[in-house]
């Protein structure tokens, strides 16, 4: 009948637009295993004046669109996690110097982690959600920073740390989504996937 909304397809094929093992593990907690993984290769540089929350939302949507173009008719899930202090976006640490700078900046201070989720349904509809988590790190000694650097957990991580590793011991206080800080906020992800017709635990 004209004007009626199209029915939601039940259990469409899920494509995860990320090769992140931590996102795969988090999805498994929802009883979900993607049919395919499509890692996207995008320029993740912030736009001029872009704030951390907007950066996360934009990148998640761009990753989802890029994967959807390669997997038409599928349900596509993408995410992006950004660490910010005020209006400043902290980089993903690719070398020890960057990780060291990030940890020194976060030492003894509050910061925010924005974890955006984007879903593109088989009919091309984009749905988005954002998790915002506030954390405060203890004051880190030079020795603690160097020991963490030596462990290598920081590599490729936003803000130079992985909360699911030994850096959890740095976190004196957290308000929000622990899974969002890891890389995929489960509450928001579950809500989006269920709305898209996926059978989620």
Curated annotation (Swiss-Prot):
Catalytic site: 80 (proton acceptor)
Q: Which UniProt keywords apply?
A: Cytoplasm, Hydrolase, Nucleotide metabolism
Pfam families per UniProt: Maf (PF02545)
Describe the task this protein carries out: Nucleoside triphosphate pyrophosphatase that hydrolyzes dTTP and UTP. May have a dual role in cell division arrest and in preventing the incorporation of modified nucleotides into cellular nucleic acids.
Q: Where is this site: Important for substrate specificity?
A: 22, 81, 164
The protein, known as: dTTP/UTP pyrophosphatase
Q: Where are the transmembrane segments?
A: none
Localisation: Cytoplasm
Q: Which cofactors does it use?
A: a divalent metal cation
Q: Which PANTHER family match?
A: BIFUNCTIONAL DTTP/UTP PYROPHOSPHATASE/METHYLTRANSFERASE PROTEIN-RELATED, BIFUNCTIONAL DTTP_UTP PYROPHOSPHATASE_METHYLTRANSFERASE PROTEIN-RELATED
């Amino acid at each position: 009948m004209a004007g009626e909304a199209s029915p939601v397809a039940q259990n469409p094929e899920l494509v995860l637009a990320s090769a992140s093992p931590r996102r795969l593990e988090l999805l498994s907690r929802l009883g979900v295993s993607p049919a395919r993984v499509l890692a996207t290769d995008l320029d993740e540089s912030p736009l001029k004046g872009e704030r951390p929350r907007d950066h996360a939302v934009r990148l998640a949507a761009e990753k989802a669109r890029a994967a959807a173009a390669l997997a038409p008719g599928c349900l596509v899930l993408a995410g992006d996690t950004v660490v910010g202090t005020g209006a400043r976006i902290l980089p993903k640490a690719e070398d020890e110097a960057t990780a060291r700078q990030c940890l020194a900046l976060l030492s003894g201070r509050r910061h925010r982690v924005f974890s955006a989720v984007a879903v593109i349904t088989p009919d091309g509809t984009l749905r988005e959600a954002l998790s915002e988590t506030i954390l405060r790190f203890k004051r880190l000694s030079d020795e603690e920073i160097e020991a963490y650097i030596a462990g290598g957990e920081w590599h490729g991580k936003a803000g130079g740390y992985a909360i699911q590793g030994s850096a959890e011991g740095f976190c004196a206080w957290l308000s929000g989504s622990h899974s969002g800080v890891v890389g995929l906020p489960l509450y928001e992800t579950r809500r989006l996937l269920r709305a898209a017709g996926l059978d989620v635990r």
